[in-house]
Amino acid sequence: MDLTEWIVTIIMMIEFLLGNCANFFIMVVNAIDCMKRRKISSADRIITALAISRIGLLWAMLMNWHSRVYTTDTYSFQVTAFSGIIWAITNHFTTWLGTILSMFYLFKIANFSNCLFLHLKRKLDSVLLVIFLVSSLLVFAYLGVVNIKKIAWLSVHEGNVTVKSKLMNIASIRDTLLFSLINIAPFGISLTCVLLLIYSLGKHLKNMKFYGKGCQDQSTMVHIRALQTVVSFLLLYATYSSCVIISGWSIQNVPIFLFCVTIGAFYPAGHSCILIWGNQKLKQFLLLFLRQMKC
């Protein structure tokens, strides 16, 4: 490896370790809290599932990164296809669980008198479950069609490396286009949640000012913490999606591919750290753990 690849390797390993530690920490804390209380809240269920999916996504990204850094001849096209399936599944659940978390914050925190909003708020758990199940059916249908066709192409041209390489490039570009189309929905929903939370916060501050009260009340702080979580998710998700699209179009350009994968890995690692710091329970456990480490 040259100097650039060594630098990318070090950064990737730091992100990989940080992301796994952060997500594993979330899983352990919520598991301990669940055993103590004998129940788990809806928010903790979503965050725990999100942490599990992000651990899987980090490992899938590491597999793709490893296949480009080291000799690609050691990787069969079937192994590459398998790692692609793992990435597609974990990426899908990471995206939609993050979107569902944004919706959860919106309906739990925002205050609107709209009849549809109030109806969805009353049925929130059922609404989120339906969204999760429908999105799951879509991803498995997508994987069934795309990967069966990809494996069939490669099997027909088993002995022709040149043709197989071209087919992989075509499949990568096609998958990138499908990725862009599929991710319009969760990105649009998350963006809508951000805008509605901002509007709700603005309306709340206006009411507080009208009644002559201060702006640092509990509802304002809850709005701000939710916005920090949702906005950070949206920005990191947009950055990650851009990296996936660029890497899909530049799969033969190894430096660009590795750079995009490394930047994209900050999404499942960085947002989990933001979740820990923005969640009162997780933050308290983290500070307690750090104090015990110092002793």
Curated annotation (Swiss-Prot):
GO biological process: detection of chemical stimulus involved in sensory perception of bitter taste
Transmembrane residue ranges: 6-26, 46-66, 84-104, 126-146, 178-198, 231-251, 256-276
Pfam families, per database record: TAS2R
InterPro entries according to UniProt: TAS2R (IPR007960)
UniProt-recorded Gene Ontology molecular function terms: bitter taste receptor activity; G protein-coupled receptor activity
Keywords of this entry: G-protein coupled receptor, Glycoprotein, Membrane, Receptor, Sensory transduction, Taste, Transducer, Transmembrane, Transmembrane helix
KW Protein biosynthesis (keyword) present: no
Glycosylation sites: N160
Subcellular location: Membrane
Record-level GO cellular component terms: membrane
Membrane topology of this protein: Multi-pass membrane protein
Zinc among keywords: no
Topology Cytoplasmic: residue spans: 27-45, 105-125, 199-230, 277-295
Superkingdom to which the source organism belongs: Eukaryota
Record topology, Extracellular segments: 1-5, 67-83, 147-177, 252-255
Anything else known: Several bitter taste receptors are expressed in a single taste receptor cell.
Family stated for the protein in its record: Belongs to the G-protein coupled receptor T2R family.
Function statement: Putative taste receptor which may play a role in the perception of bitterness.
Name of the featured protein: Taste receptor type 2 member 120
Gene: Tas2r120
